[in-house]
Regions:
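Active-site diphosphate/adenylate-binding microenvironment
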Residues: 138-162
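Well-ordered alpha-helical scaffold segments within catalytic/enzyme domains
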Residues: 134-145, 190-207
């Protein structure tokens, strides 16, 4: 009771060191103080993008302690994403090409959690419209995503209704410096490019009809 477990997320080990500067202001830590009872614990209202997870144990006085034997077995990582089926696959005789495709596929899985985000780990994790439209064609090849994109574009039109039809940089929009901006070329192209790419891949004009007034 009173002992603390600290989980810290990171993507890389730089020269053998636990490196998190690329996370910028994202703390990416989970602290749990035990009440002395055996519990199954998980984070709420957040998620982490990581390759490595550091586990630290702190006693009641705040001093680091040795980890219990076999403690790694007490942790399980769960992958979170929106539910869609994979429809595309590339396999060649070149391992590096195959790995490149897998990296792109997992990049999509990691960033498709309710909205198409720019990254799953640092202090953004936002639905940038520029990122969404430029990756949309690849996304349609990889996964069956018409419903996913329809929901995102519904959110976009809701934001447009608030800012006079302009397309925001980020959907859903946040009131933060630069992020709350709207009406820029490339980012605003999402209103045309994304519904068009969905139509080309799936042949359904419904999304075009829904989005046309906001184009």
């Amino acid at each position: 009771e009173g002992e603390e477990i600290i989980l810290s997320a990171a993507e890389i080990l730089q020269d053998g060191c636990f490196y998190r500067e690329n996370y910028r202001s994202a703390v990416a830590e989970y602290h749990f103080i035990s009440d002395g009872k055996k519990r199954h614990v998980r984070p709420h209202f957040t998620f982490y993008g990581f390759r490595y997870m550091k586990v630290e144990y702190v006693d009641k006085s705040g001093k680091p302690t040795e980890k219990p034997e076999g403690s790694v077995d007490n942790f399980t990582a769960h992958h979170l994403r929106s539910d869609f089926d994979q429809t595309g696959c590339i396999e060649t005789g070149v391992k590096k090409v195959n790995q490149l495709f897998q990296n792109a596929l997992w990049g999509q899985k990691d960033n498709f959690l309710d909205v198409p985000t720019d990254c799953p780990q640092r202090d953004e994790r936002l639905g940038w419209t520029g990122d969404a439209q430029i990756f949309s064609e690849t996304a349609c090849y990889n996964m069956y995503v018409p419903a996913f994109y329809r929901k995102y574009l519904w959110d976009m039109r809701a934001e447009q209704s608030i800012i006079g039809g302009s397309v925001p940089h980020v959907v859903p929009r946040l009131k933060r410096e630069f992020i709350e901006g709207h009406g820029s070329c490339a980012w605003a192209d999402v209103a045309v490019v994304l519904p068009w790419n969905v139509y080309v891949h799936y042949g359904d004009k419904t999304l075009l009809e829904e989005c046309y007034p906001g184009m």
